[in-house]
Amino acid sequence: MSSFQVYRAALLLSILATANAQQVGTYTTETHPSLTWQTCTSDGSCTTNDGEVVIDANWRWVHSTSSATNCYTGNEWDTSICTDDVTCAANCALDGATYEATYGVTTSGSELRLNFVTQGSSKNIGSRLYLMSDDSNYELFKLLGQEFTFDVDVSNLPCGLNGALYFVAMDADGGTSEYSGNKAGAKYGTGYCDSQCPRDLKFINGEANCDGWEPSSNNVNTGVGDHGSCCAEMDVWEANSISNAFTAHPCDSVSQTMCDGDSCGGTYSASGDRYSGTCDPDGCDYNPYRLGNTDFYGPGLTVDTNSPFTVVTQFITDDGTSSGTLTEIKRLYVQNGEVIANGASTYSSVNGSSITSAFCESEKTLFGDENVFDKHGGLEGMGEAMAKGMVLVLSLWDDYAADMLWLDSDYPVNSSASTPGVARGTCSTDSGVPATVEAESPNAYVTYSNIKFGPIGSTYSSGSSSGSGSSSSSSSTTTKATSTTLKTTSTTSSGSSSTSAAQAYGQCGGQGWTGPTTCVSGYTCTYENAYYSQCL
């Protein structure tokens, strides 16, 4: 994934902490916005958790520990303070954030809203936040054999923007226990990594990234240092109102690692070195439009992006347990009370509507893409990172590297749109230029709400209200999900509501399964493996 940009000219005074490592400033108290989310069980009961979110360290004011002097201004480090990575970390501090006024981040109950352009004392573009379990640690999700559900409103995201919700294999504490130079930790949003091995991060592994720093040629606020931060990435949702994709990006290591120079690979390295790193920067992606299903997602289409909807992602294992091997990543939607199956590929050589090893191999072959996915472990490697636990990222960004054309237009732009895999959406190849998007769509925003996590089939039939963004429960409150009538646009049968039958796309069998073994009208209990059958 490409990096995110922020326009911030800090004009603050501070009283600063002093010590011998990357520090925390004290001018602005860090207060994390609250965000509720739910954990569900197989019987349909969901418990509300009182969580909070934190903005990434790259967005924060970085200043001297002995004065209000910026350590980083525009897209350059102050070399009188930052003579090298270690010294810079000792001399500089990260300060607290004013989330709404500076970054356009607001929460209400279970809803998080991210504004695109925020003009306060300085100009901010986009944001990247993490869900926390407490004030000093990120929440870790172990996705294997589970289901992750959320509501999203992308109606105000035009071409060139990406409202991305995804998981990365960051350290739960942001790196404080492993790297003594990191005194800020998860409380201040440190420790980011992804499959692009981003080199635009200001701090990595408790050190600054000022050595070899080259200011960006097309962005006055960013640059690239000698080091990158690598880890596995599961893009559950990358989308605007035109296109969407979900993508698995495995890495050789299940934990975060630091890389050097162009050997990092990914977006931030020379074009010839894109695949030289330890991660898969391309991943195995599922974009319905790219797979020929051009009438499935968008304004007024099957999944109508003019209105909020629910996104359900299932991480299915070979034995149906949380300790099994990842074999499939499946997508469902719920909108206006209807369960909608994912838009299937229209290419005869690429079958299905989910990510499997067979799908990834056939898609790479059809599109002529290099199969770096298998080189770095494929689905099994992705599953190993999930088993360790991954951090939830919620973000909104524009793309200075490729104008987001890889998501919503024809890409590469010098290839024919009729070539399989080139067309990814209806946006013009001239769209997505950050300066234009920022000028023409400053009021764009995305909302995420009603996050739920639990066993497969436990979250999306529990009466979530798309876009409601409200929760009256505390962390000790348990609610019992009620059965609702679910329909699908992929069949002429509307189904029926029944307490004795599994709902559309729900689990209906498998070893150890004690729930219903028949499906509502119009659906058949379909064998997936010995531990899991589903109403399809």
UniProtKB/Swiss-Prot annotation:
Keyword hit for Signal: yes
CDD domains: GH7_CBH_EG
UniProt keyword Secreted present: yes
Residues spanning the signal sequence: 1-21
Swiss-Prot/TrEMBL keywords: Carbohydrate metabolism, Cellulose degradation, Disulfide bond, Glycoprotein, Glycosidase, Hydrolase, Polysaccharide degradation, Secreted, Signal
Glycan attachment sites: 351, 414
Sequence ranges assigned to domain CBM1 in this UniProt record: 500-536
Gene3D superfamilies, A to Z: Glycoside hydrolase, family 7, domain
Biological process, per Gene Ontology: cellulose catabolic process
GO molecular function: cellulose 1,4-beta-cellobiosidase activity; cellulose binding
EC numbers, comma separated: 3.2.1.91
Enzyme type, top EC level: hydrolase
Family classification: Belongs to the glycosyl hydrolase 7 (cellulase C) family.
Protein name (database record): Probable 1,4-beta-D-glucan cellobiohydrolase B
Species of provenance: Aspergillus niger (strain ATCC MYA-4892 / CBS 513.88 / FGSC A1513)
